[in-house]
Amino acid sequence: MKSLFLTGLLSALTWASEFASYPDIPLDYLYTTEPVTPLPQGYPWGSKTANDSHPEEPTLTGVIRSYDFHIKAGQIAPDGYLKDVLLVNDQYPGPLIEANWGDTIQVTVHNDLEEGTALHWHAFLQKETPWQDGVPGITQCPIAPGACFTYTFVADSYGTSWYHSHYSAQYADGILGPIIVHGHPTVPYDIDLGPIMLSDLYHVPYTTVLEHLFDEDFAVVTKPANNNLINGRNSWNCTLKDLGDDTPCQSNAPLSEFRLTPGKKHRLRILNVGGSAIQKFSLDGHKLQVIAHDFVPVLPYEVEFLTLGVGQRADVIVEALANGTGTYTMRATIPPAPCANSVDHDATALVHYGNTTSTFSNSSSEAWPSFIEALGVCDGLPTEEITPWYAIPAPEAPATTQIINVTLAQNETGQYLFYMDNSSFRVNYNHPVLLLSNLGNNSYPDDPEWNVYNFGSNNSIRIVMYNNAIRTHPIHLHGHNFFVEAVGLGEWDGHVDHPENPVRRDTAMLPQGGYMVISFNADNPGAWPLHCHVAWHVSSGFYVTVLERPDEIAEYKIPSVVGQTCRDWWGYTNHTIVNQIDSGL
């Protein structure tokens, strides 16, 4: 059984009579005829293997995978409570994008909203196409209402990822979907169950969450989510509605369902695509063999549960019981503070053996004791427990080091904001940093709130982040799979974990009261966001731009359509006031 999503717009509180499924996921790669795939060597990427080829240097296949997305407002009831949402092609989660390593992905985005938008392709490196990264005010202007923009970029890494809006906190309302890039096989398996997307759920629109965060009560943190979802589904007890809340609601909404074949090995692609919460994931009675973190294949290791911050992914193999019968429970749980604002509802899904079909089947399986015991632990395994499959050494002595102190403080009007070295971020949608840099403008003394760190032509960069604020934070860097050199509490002592082959990720956890040290080779000229992936935190200023090799950015021939997108946006803002309540991202 493939991953399930809610589809269509609901004019009344009903669930769709048919829940559409993501297409069957092939075990190896997608087949095409124009041009012919696979190549004579047997794979779309030729004779390369996971052992002998750099995972960020694909063979270009010449195949274009085209998609057409319409983004519009709607209403759905993911857990039985009807809510306003923003949807991609009337689906939640949005459509699956699927490609082979080295294919070109092309997505035309039509903005049918009454506000701007832009889509970001999480963890794609965008080498030589940084203007396709999809971050308004940084790599492009927002797509104006009624306008469209076509993103074209190479599937330059392989594994599991996702796309989402990067305009304000829109994606928390539903503008997101999974991406699968087929690449080198590492660990064999028999069946691919596809994406399993974990997300916290707010019953109110994202704008209401932001208004609460920035209102006169000077909230330090957002209100906790109302529920938690697996592939867009869970149930909710409608008797918990606030007094006077007349929103249509029905308890016992259907859960997501999956099916295991006895004795077979199944690949599960787990993604945390929520707005805020760290997720604990497990499957009762079945251990998880981890084979990839983010877009990085790793030497396989076995666990009973996973811990994923927002933006993080893990590919795992589950071997079904040889004589398995009945139904088991899949669990996604939001841990309490300091990991997240606690919520009193876990997400569950049903995993069947045999021919069980009832959506409301009860599972009698029990959670792993280790899963229960670890609910108060915010981070996953220590970095020394994870070994990338393909070894890449960290820069021996990075050319430059930047220390960033993260704090939480009130601004002049009393609102709590995050500060990066005493500067809270705010974007200017009308003047994308990448386009300014392309014109030779790399200094912004009149706009310190842009938080641009110009690293010049340095060939390697180390960033040391200290968390003097609240909570553990999932830190995401665009344009790179960075080396996680060290993570810990207190002050960094200068030690680098496994410098010959450190953990590589695009999103890693910065602990409360601690530090995270990352480094990367500066081989990708661009304006790359570095930010907390909690939607409400980046909305509150937890963000900087890494300006990498601006001398080479000036040499880019940026397509004219990027400029036209700005002209369309400027035309829209000439007669419409943009209510930028937050940082803009």
UniProtKB/Swiss-Prot annotation:
Belongs to the multicopper oxidase family. Oxydoreductase; part of the gene cluster that mediates the biosynthesis of pestheic acid, a diphenyl ether which is a biosynthetic precursor of the unique chloropupukeananes. The biosynthesis initiates from condensation of acetate and malonate units catalyzed by the non-reducing PKS ptaA. As the ptaA protein is TE/CLC domain-deficient, hydrolysis and Claisen cyclization of the polyketide could be catalyzed by ptaB containing a beta-lactamase domain. The keyword Glycoprotein applies. This is Oxydoreductase ptaK. Gene3D superfamilies: Cupredoxins - blue copper proteins. One of its GO terms (molecular function) is copper ion binding. Disruption phenotype: Does not affect the production of pestheic acid. Pathway: Secondary metabolite biosynthesis. Induction: The cluster is expressed in rice fermentation medium. Three regulators are located in the cluster (ptaR1, ptaR2 and ptaR3), suggesting that the production of pestheic acid is controlled by a complex regulatory mechanism. Keywords: Copper, Glycoprotein, Metal-binding, Oxidoreductase, Repeat, Signal. It comes from Pestalotiopsis fici (strain W106-1 / CGMCC3.15140). Its EC number is 1.-.-.-. Residues 1-20 form the signal peptide. Residues 71-184, 195-355, 431-551 form the Plastocyanin-like domain. Glycans are attached at residues 51, 237, 323, 355, 362, 405, 411, 422, 441, 458, 574. The lineage of its organism: Eukaryota, Fungi, Dikarya, Ascomycota, Pezizomycotina. InterPro entries: Cu-oxidase-like_N, Cu-oxidase_2nd, Cu-oxidase_C, Cu-oxidase_fam, Cupredoxin. The gene is ptaK. Pfam families: Cu-oxidase, Cu-oxidase_2, Cu-oxidase_3.
